[in-house]
């Protein structure tokens, strides 16, 4: 404990009410956030002669100040604790790294409803189904639904401005409600109802209704219609046969935990209406000497209480670990949801099977992560040996991408001891250079990246320059001219030139722009990590360049038309669903866009056609 912090004097002022406490180090940084039913009793436990763990000893040794916030109830304290953890990201708390909102399938409340993926606050009128573990699961489900139930998935701006059906109608993936006369209101509403039932887990009702309609069509000698409905029945059956469905039809989140070598994996199964919508593995940041019980309790609290605005709470949460605050957590979640939420740790039947599945997935994911981490460590150790460095904790790599010198983008990717650190990847739009001058582009991005103050922990051990001797010379010149407070001589600048025919394993490495380079054996672990970070940088640069090129492509042809400024250009693209939709539109359709007169519509039409 810090000599400046008087624990006895502080504890005399602390109340015995519930609340939250924040501990600060000498630099004024919050290093730990906790809650307590009795603040005085809880805080006194930190200053006993025999502390519970090495982690607590290390924490107490750094305490310079403690702030206390009193709350009315223990539930309020729990909510406030997790809000503070999210805000301060204290180093001694278990931290949930991923706090993104989860995607849902959205069925709009329009006259002709559409299906779409939705993330974030649920302001739009309609129905939301989910949550799904990631965007891929939603897109896969939407593609499947489109094959079985052909209701529209287009944006309203496209739907409102069509005079003829699109390709989705031609291939049987949409009933074409945008064009009058293609589908009756009753038929479209029936397909929407099938989607609603299907996403609610009521597959049997969908099949019963479809079979009844098929039999009616057959009796009325409408054999083509009966055959179409038969195909739809078969499609529904194919999908439902592949799913493991619980007989209960409940909404559950099932949480399994694995813990090994100081790393934890928490695996969450999302079950809605008895169907497994998917699952996701999380690897929370765990301070050294942390007990598994703290990992589980903190993760569960952060997972539900920090993201409650964006996350639909299930009726029941299954855990394979006993929580000391289980009742408090259940009460807090019930209060947030406005309904009863159960937290169960000893389920039976199907629920026990789900829990076993989550536990197995957590163990498998953790084993894979540890193996991957071990491989990265081995490769970085090998690289440090090759480069004659004590260690390599952080690497950064740069690449340049452009098309014939236009829309130049530079990328910087970062690797740490665990591999790619994607949260710190950056793209830089390069301007003010001669088109196609890669050397000037590299010079600019390095100055922008390193010509400023950098935290000591962010100074790379190795900076990899993709491009060989010329680009390495630019990097050397930039670093020689840098006037910065951090140690600019710490990073090792390493150039890498692609091999003949750009084949992997034939790269040449350079420490200096002059003289001969050297190569590593194709099976060298050091070469593998160089190839990995270089490929990541290349892909990241190309991705940014493509986005920039697409943006220019979508706007450049409109920018040449007199009378079309940024606002009108944006309105045209929005209402027509992009430049291609605008090219295919008639004068009358263009004139329907707000702010576009008949005369301007004709000018736009002829400009795009010629």
From Swiss-Prot:
The UVR domain, residue ranges: 204-239
Single GO MF descriptor: excinuclease ABC activity
PROSITE patterns: GIY_YIG, UVR, UVRC
Record's keyword annotation contains Cytoplasm: yes
Subcellular location: Cytoplasm
Pfam families per UniProt: GIY-YIG (PF01541), HHH_5 (PF14520), UVR (PF02151), UvrC_RNaseH (PF22920), UvrC_RNaseH_dom (PF08459)
Main location: cytoplasm
GO CC annotation: cytoplasm; excinuclease repair complex
Superkingdom of this protein's organism: Bacteria
Key words, A-Z: Cytoplasm, DNA damage, DNA excision, DNA repair, Excision nuclease, SOS response
Protein's GO biological process: nucleotide-excision repair; SOS response
Span of domain GIY-YIG: 16-94
Entries under InterPro entries matching the protein: GIY-YIG_endonuc, GIY-YIG_endonuc_sf, GIY-YIG_UvrC_Cho, Hlx-hairpin-Hlx_DNA-bd_motif, RuvA_2-like, UVR_dom, UVR_dom_sf, UvrABC_protein_C
Role according to the record: The UvrABC repair system catalyzes the recognition and processing of DNA lesions. UvrC both incises the 5' and 3' sides of the lesion. The N-terminal half is responsible for the 3' incision and the C-terminal half is responsible for the 5' incision.
Subunit structure: Interacts with UvrB in an incision complex.
Family under the similarity heading: Belongs to the UvrC family.
The protein's name: UvrABC system protein C
